[in-house]
C-alpha cells in the first residue's frame, strides 16, 4: 500500500463498486462512504457493506441523510410515487433525487479533507444517465471548482469520475477486468430481495452485461 487515500461514494451498486476496483488498481487505500437517505431501496446499504468487506477497507462510514426523504420530489424517497419505467431519455426521470449528488460530494469532500485523502471517486455516467443533471461532466467540473475554493486540502483533492464517458457495457467490461465483485451488488430501485428487471436501473444493468457478453450474477424475479 502506498499510503495514498481515496474516498469512494459507495452505493452498493454496479457503478460505485466498479469505482472501488478502479481506486484499488490505482494503488489507493480506499475509504468508502454510503448514505441512508430514506431511499426505498435501502437494501443497497447492506450490499455496500459486503463490497467494502470484500475490498478489506480500513473503514466504511454510513451517513444518515433522512432529510432528503422529507424534501421529497423523487420516487426513490416518496413511496406515494411510482418508480419510472419509461427508460432513459432527455427528460429528467422521477427517480432523480433533487440535490443528492451535490450533497454526497460535499460530504465526501469534507471527509476527504479530514483524513487527508487526495481523490474522491464517484460512479456517475453521463452516457447512461442523460436525464440526470448531476451526472453531467459540467456538474462534476463545477463541484471540482467548489472543492478547490471551499476547502483547505493540501494538496488539493480531485474528483475522479472514471465512468463518466463509458456505456454500461464498457463499465461492466472494466469491472470484470478488475475482478470487481458484481455478485455482491444491487441496482434495483424497488429494493426487493431479487431485482425486478423492469426499472430503469435494472434495465441498464442487464443491457450492460449483454453488451459485455457476460451474465449478470445477481438474481432477478
Swiss-Prot record:
It is an enzyme of class 6 (ligase). ATP binds at residues 10-20. The keyword Endoplasmic reticulum does not apply. Keywords: ATP-binding, Ligase, Metal-binding, Nucleotide-binding, Queuosine biosynthesis, Zinc. Its EC number is 6.3.4.20. Binds 1 zinc ion per subunit. Pathway: Purine metabolism; 7-cyano-7-deazaguanine biosynthesis. Its cofactor is Zn(2+). SUPFAM superfamilies: Adenine nucleotide alpha hydrolases-like. Zn(2+) binds at residues 188, 196, 199, 202. Signal peptide: none annotated. GO terms for biological process: queuosine biosynthetic process. Pfam families: QueC (PF06508). Homodimer. Belongs to the QueC family. Catalyzes the ATP-dependent conversion of 7-carboxy-7-deazaguanine (CDG) to 7-cyano-7-deazaguanine (preQ(0)). This is 7-cyano-7-deazaguanine synthase. It comes from Oceanobacillus iheyensis (strain DSM 14371 / CIP 107618 / JCM 11309 / KCTC 3954 / HTE831). The gene is queC.
Amino acid at each position: 500500500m502506498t499510503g495514498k487515500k481515496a474516498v469512494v461514494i459507495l452505493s452498493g451498486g454496479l457503478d460505485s463498486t466498479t469505482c472501488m476496483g478502479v481506486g484499488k488498481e490505482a494503488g489507493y487505500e480506499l475509504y468508502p462512504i454510503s448514505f441512508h437517505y430514506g431511499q426505498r431501496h435501502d437494501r443497497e446499504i447492506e450490499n455496500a457493506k459486503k463490497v467494502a468487506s470484500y475490498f478489506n477497507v480500513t473503514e466504511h462510514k454510513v451517513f444518515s441523510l433522512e432529510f432528503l426523504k422529507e424534501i421529497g420530489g423523487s420516487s426513490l424517497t416518496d413511496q406515494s410515487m411510482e418508480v419510472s419505467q419509461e427508460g432513459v431519455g432527455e427528460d429528467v426521470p422521477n427517480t432523480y433525487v433533487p440535490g443528492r449528488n451535490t450533497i454526497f460530494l460535499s460530504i465526501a469532500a469534507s471527509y476527504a479533507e479530514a483524513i487527508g485523502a487526495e481523490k474522491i471517486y464517484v460512479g456517475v455516467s453521463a452516457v447512461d444517465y442523460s436525464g440526470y443533471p448531476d451526472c453531467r461532466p459540467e456538474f462534476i467540473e463545477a463541484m471540482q471548482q467548489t472543492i478547490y475554493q471551499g476547502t483547505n486540502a493540501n494538496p488539493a483533492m480531485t474528483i475522479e469520475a472514471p465512468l463518466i464517458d463509458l456505456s454500461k457495457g464498457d463499465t461492466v467490461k472494466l469491472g470484470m477486468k478488475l475482478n470487481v465483485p458484481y455478485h455482491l451488488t444491487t441496482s434495483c430501485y424497488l429494493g426487493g430481495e431479487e431485482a425486478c428487471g423492469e426499472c430503469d436501473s435494472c434495465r441498464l444493468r442487464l443491457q450492460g452485461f449483454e453488451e459485455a457478453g457476460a451474465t449478470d450474477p445477481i438474481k432477478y424475479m
